[in-house]
Structures are given as structure tokens and as C-alpha cells.
Amino acid sequence: MEPLPKSGTPKLTREEAEKIVKNKLGAEAPTPVLIGVRGYYSKMGVEGKNDTNIYDDAIIVLGKDYQTFNANTDPSFVKKEGRALSFIKEGVYKFAKGKHKNKYNALRAYPEGVEIPCVRDGKTSTAQYINIHMGGEVGKDTTWSEGCQTVPKRQWNKFIELVYSEMNRVKAPTITYILITNEEMKKILG
């Protein structure tokens, strides 16, 4: 299965993104902000199922500039070496600039080591050291995630440069990340 949608990047408009932010953060919401939509491409993979290891999700950068990107908000696998991986729960989180595995620019959950609510094997849990980082595009572990949020390699540089630029523009040490489901997005947008 092709890990990226054939239709290109998500088609969510700026106005729709602003409506989501207003719903989740209120009228005086700060910008820039990131919006993650789990299951944005509901017909990609198994229809009606939240798939792993494909870019069937979306991540939106809303600030002075606006851009949508393909994304993955799930781990590449349900388990790795017998260990249940984390599916981050929908919610509002803070991220800061940082390195992924000390190798390249990424976003790291803030404050460092914060416990983020997640589900592992259907059980409520928490996860630490969640990043938004570059994913892969081919192979067995396409999205390169053990619970982090990932953007395809071919879109990564444009994504992270835009996010860092938006954060620098307003001198923001952190950026808000809203994670919702496709179903919640549809309810908000009416």
C-alpha cells in the first residue's frame, strides 16, 4: 500500500483551521498553532479503521503563513519487541524546538519529560519524550514512529522550517498542538 495519499496534501482551508482553533482554544487563541487530525483520510487504508504505518492523518501550521502537510499520529506498529506502543490521546499539548535523537531540528513535548495521556493495547497510560519529527516513506517501518507524530521525509524540511519561522516571528518558546479526530473535525466544521 502506498503510504502517502494520491490526492496530495490535506485540503483543509485556513478558515476551517481557524474555526477548529477557536473551538478548542477560544476566540483569543495564540498563533502560531499546529493542528493534527487523526484519520483525516478516512478512506485510505482500511476504511473506517485507524490505520498504522501510513500517512492518513494531517498536520496544519496556522500562523501568519498557512500550510497543510500529510502526517502520521500513530505508532508504526501496535507492539515492538513485545512492548505496547503509545497512541497519544486527542487533546492540547505544548511543544518546543529541539533535536530528535540529537540529530536534526524537530519539536519536543514541553516541558521536557512531560507525561502525555495515551493508550497502549487499549489501556489508558502515559508517554514521555513525544516528538514531532521526520518520518520515512518506504519499507516495513514507513512512518518511523513509536508514538511520536511524524511528517513524511519529502515534506519535513518545509514543515519544520515553517514552524520554526512562525515561532521566531512571534518570539514564542513553545507552540500549541491540537490533536483531534476526523470525526471531531467534522462536528466542529458542521
Q: What are these model-derived regions, one by one?
A:
Residues 1-142, 157, 161-164, 170-175, ...:
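Cell wall/extracellular polymer interaction/catalysis modules
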Residues 145:
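Local cysteine-cluster metal-coordination motifs and their immediate loop/turn environment
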